Amino acid sequence: MNNDDIILAEMRPKKRAGRRVFKETRHPVYRGIRRRNGDKWVCEVREPTHQRRIWLGTYPTADMAARAHDVAVLALRGRSACLNFADSAWRLPVPESNDPDVIRRVAAEAAEMFRPVDLESGITVLPCAGDDVDLGFGSGSGSGSGSEERNSSSYGFGDYEEVSTTMMRLAEGPLMSPPRSYMEDMTPTNVYTEEEMCYEDMSLWSYRY
């Protein structure tokens, strides 16, 4: 199918919805889908030779539902199908028959190909720095003085003394003299100033043949 032969939904403006429920829930551009429960999108198509509709399922995004619609109309109408996306003609799988169950299964599989990454299952969301994190100090979820008492009771006096000693050693580190081996290497012949080191690097790139 050539791109010139593809019929897109955006090329055919929708008719005004008669009932209020369809006016408020249907998508302004995509065909065959409408909003349900505020954040879900449902999809269904009508068979060309019958008045019955084929239910294609509920999806978390409008794009996924629109892709399911394109799979169904490609199976039912072929080259005369009005698609929501131009690349659906070659990108989506086409059901091998017009059986509603087959169309529904292939449409659902095709829609999953376009599921956003942030909606995939199995993703672990790490807490932010400002979130409350349960460190396992107790089964309760209290806050304020109660949680502070649990945190303080989990540390003994020896732990505080060890932490205090470590902090004092870190504070005294910059005041201590460097080791003798380091001082012996710091002779006038091998000490570079910052400017000399800069020119040393520049000579590698400024050498002329």
Swiss-Prot record:
Localisation: Nucleus
Role according to the record: Transcriptional activator that binds specifically to the DNA sequence 5'-[AG]CCGAC-3'. Binding to the C-repeat/DRE element mediates cold or dehydration-inducible transcription. CBF/DREB1 factors play a key role in freezing tolerance and cold acclimation.
DNA-binding region: 29-86
SUPFAM superfamilies cross-referenced by the UniProt entry: DNA-binding domain
Any one biological process term the GO annotation gives: regulation of unidimensional cell growth
CDD domains, per database record: AP2
Stated family: Belongs to the AP2/ERF transcription factor family. ERF subfamily.
Pfam families linked: AP2 (PF00847)
Protein name: Dehydration-responsive element-binding protein 1F
Extent of motif Nuclear localization signal: 14-26
Region (Disordered): 137-157
Cellular component, GO annotation: nucleus
GO molecular function: DNA-binding transcription factor activity; sequence-specific DNA binding; transcription cis-regulatory region binding
Keywords tagged on the record: Activator, DNA-binding, Nucleus, Stress response, Transcription, Transcription regulation
Induction or repression: By high-salt stress.
Chief localization: nucleus
Protein source organism: Arabidopsis thaliana
Top-level taxon in the UniProt lineage: Eukaryota
